Curated annotation (Swiss-Prot):
Residues 306-321 have a biased composition (Acidic residues). Phosphorylated. GO terms for cellular component: cytosolic large ribosomal subunit. Residues 284-321 are annotated as: Disordered. P0 forms a pentameric complex by interaction with dimers of P1 and P2. Keywords: Phosphoprotein, Ribonucleoprotein, Ribosomal protein. PANTHER family: 60S ACIDIC RIBOSOMAL PROTEIN P0, LARGE RIBOSOMAL SUBUNIT PROTEIN UL10. Signal peptide: none annotated. GO terms for biological process: cytoplasmic translation; ribosomal large subunit assembly. Induction: By blue light. Belongs to the universal ribosomal protein uL10 family. This is Large ribosomal subunit protein uL10. GO terms for molecular function: large ribosomal subunit rRNA binding; structural constituent of ribosome.
Amino acid sequence: MAVKPTKAEKKIAYDQKLCQLLDEYSQVLIASADNVGSNQLQAIRIGLRGDSIVLMGKNTMMKRSIRLHAENTGNENLRNVEQLFLPNVGLIFTKGDLNQVREEISKYKVGAPARFGLVAPIDVVVPPGNTGLDPSQTSFFQVLNIPTKINKGTVEIITAVELIKKGEKVGSSEAALLAKLGIRPFSYGLNVESVYDDGSVFSPEVLDLTEDDLLARFATGVSMVTSLSLAISYPTLAAAPHSSSMGATMFLLLLLQPTMTSLRPRKLRSISRILAVASCSCSSAGTAPTGGGAAAAAVEEKKEEPEEESDDDIGFSLFDD
């Protein structure tokens, strides 16, 4: 006959298992387990078998084990896990892709009836339509101020009604009506509340971000930095091409301002081309990977210029009367 371990021995074994998992796994999903049954939890364990382990336990025992293990190993990052604990918490240690593990967990959520006294996790709306109940059941609807009518010997709900709001407790009348209608409005399972990844802690919403989302946010950040740099005249790499272009344009305009009114139309056209080439060259220098690209762009620009006037019409002769 096997000897049953004592409570102290169970606590020691649990502590050793938790410490071993903390050393072996660098990724932990912290999940709430409200209203999750043992059969449902067993199904989740089977579904995650291979690269993930689900560990449940009392909060006080888990916090104590993590705190002592962090002190013994000198890994203070583990204290971040301790601060994320909620009532009825579960730890999911994994070596797989965090997003895939979370999706696998969500598959095991099951529908549940609205029992009296439960706090509603979502808004419960009763849809319009025929209920299939006989007219003697109208008292349930009248108590809850649900508009109904009798249609072909059955009770029909006229308009949709918000029966229970999120965060409210389910009353006896609401629970009885939903049971008669066969509505199971709630679903329960492990809900990932926080993510621990090698010392970093973040919200599970981060797992929903795609590469396109990251690129869009990066582009927005660069645009904001560029605008701010230009506004306060502070040099940054992002604003360098724009600053160079604006600087070259302003410099030429300042030089030409005293004689601008006396220039001939042909010389004004030459000035416009010079400003355009300067702007294009500065922009190319800021975006091209090497200097050769800017030079090639300048040469190509030169080739495309129509030879309308001689060399005497451009250059320093612009400042002559």
